[in-house]
Amino acid sequence: MVGDTIAAVATPPGEGGIGIVRVSGPGARDVLKAVFRPRYGRGVDDWASHTLHLGTIIHPDDHRVIDEALVAWMVAPRTFTTEDVVEFHCHGGSVPVRETLGAVLRAGARLAEPGEFTRRAFLGGRLDLAQAEAIIEVIRAKTRDGLGAAVSQLEGQLSRRIRKVRDDLLALLAHLEAMIDFPEEDLPDIGSERICTDLMQIQRQIGDMLERSRTGRVLREGWRTVIVGRPNVGKSSLMNALLDEQRAIVTEIPGTTRDAIEEYIDLGGIPLRIVDTAGIRETEDVVERIGVEKTREYLEKADLALVVLDGSDSLTAEDETLLLSLAGRPAVVLVNKSDLAVRRLDEKRLRSLVGEMPIISVSAKEGWGLKELTELIRRMVYGDDGLGYAPDGGRLALVTQARHREALERSYAHLRQALDAVAHGASPDFLTIDLKAAWEALGEITGDTVGEDILDKIFSSFCIGK
């Protein structure tokens, strides 16, 4: 609970350069005095805030020396948690870190719950809830663009957009409630047309965030991408080229890949959850047939299909069936083996089969065409404008989390109901019900209107030292 002093290891387990034990709370100074002996200068009570000190860590019971360490001392409220904070920077072995934590707990701190340091930062007003959640997104970012989106949220880009929409809603709500509560006052009636205009403008802002949430989901979870094609067209070679390592087995024997091989790759800043699948063909081999069925299952769930064809061979019935089955779905046709002099594939026939589907000539063996593929996928994820930037030069706010998306969807739905109410001549009383619900749903994102159960669920996903 807030008010006591907590401690936890803040670095990953195992050996490393340093191991950090973090302490936060009103008793942090007492813990520090009980377990640390400075090598030089004044005692702990005379230390300035945000200073480093060399000394030894001792056990408070028998005063045995545990380790030589640097201590960082930070005084409230200018700390991450807004409380007094001390960090013990020990040698990075499991034993000195464990012994230091044990000494700290013995001196009066208790072991922190998962995410409790960040929760205290939220409760202390250091961060709002969206910013607090961004910390775990920074840690788990899979690519440069994913990191950029997380840092943008941590810096408050999303929170500022949400608060702007909430302020607009609140201004409209306040005017309507004043008209209801003080009918005797000579307040201007803004009229149903003005109300509709304001509501649609607010709804557009929410709709824009929802539209960009697809990109946010891709950066957070990865774009589910499946490499498909008949056997021996170069699917595994393509995956190895994208991974830049020999991950899949490449042979001249059709049917070598019998099970799906899944990897995360960073393709120009976009995280792809890429799957190399068994070649699609009719086969009597039971194991290979299971692999083909799995390929079809992956294809049904995919965000993108990379269809690999052999440019040195004619289109087969299997190729054509596969291409026709992908009509209307996000897919890119990759004509492989473009490094070979022999080219038998009928390009006019191919174009007639795929319509507007992009076609790129590649050589998985030589790496040709991969840059063009990367640029195409970036456009498919981001659009022609890329990630985009806000007026202040920072990245535009992206909605990356399902919780935020669901809250925006609820707010959007309440605004739609409010617009319907205005269109049907409903009284301001009915209108304010949906406006309040929309305002509260948005507040769940920043933590202004959120219950303890939601906070428990969010912070329990953090690691103990965060």
Swiss-Prot record:
Q: Which domain of life is it from?
A: Bacteria
Can you supply a Gene Ontology BP term from the record? tRNA wobble uridine modification
Family in the record? Belongs to the TRAFAC class TrmE-Era-EngA-EngB-Septin-like GTPase superfamily. TrmE GTPase family.
Q: Which Pfam families match?
A: MMR_HSR1 (PF01926), MnmE_helical (PF12631), TrmE_N (PF10396)
Query: What Gene Ontology molecular-function terms does this entry list?
Result: GTP binding; GTPase activity; metal ion binding
Localization per record: Cytoplasm
Obligatory cofactor(s): K(+)
Q: Which GO terms describe its cellular component?
A: cytosol
**EC number annotated for this UniProt entry:** 3.6.-.-
What gene name is given for the protein in this entry? mnmE
List residues binding (6S)-5-formyl-5,6,7,8-tetrahydrofolate.
22, 87, 126, 466
Predominant subcellular localization, coarse grouping = cytoplasm
Q: Which annotated residues bind Mg(2+)?
A: 236, 257
Q: Where does GTP bind?
A: 232-237, 251-257, 276-279
Instruction: Tell me the CDD domains matching this sequence.
Output: trmE, TrmE_N
Provide the residue positions that the database annotates as binding K(+): 232, 251, 253, 256
Q: What is the protein's species of origin?
A: Heliobacterium modesticaldum (strain ATCC 51547 / Ice1)
Describe the location of the TrmE-type G domain by residue ranges: 222-382
Q: How is the cofactor bound?
A: Binds 1 potassium ion per subunit.
Keywords carried by this UniProt record: Cytoplasm, GTP-binding, Hydrolase, Magnesium, Metal-binding, Nucleotide-binding, Potassium, tRNA processing
Its recorded name reads: tRNA modification GTPase MnmE
Q: Which SUPFAM superfamilies match?
A: P-loop containing nucleoside triphosphate hydrolases, TrmE connector domain
What this chain does, per the entry, is described as: Exhibits a very high intrinsic GTPase hydrolysis rate. Involved in the addition of a carboxymethylaminomethyl (cmnm) group at the wobble position (U34) of certain tRNAs, forming tRNA-cmnm(5)s(2)U34.
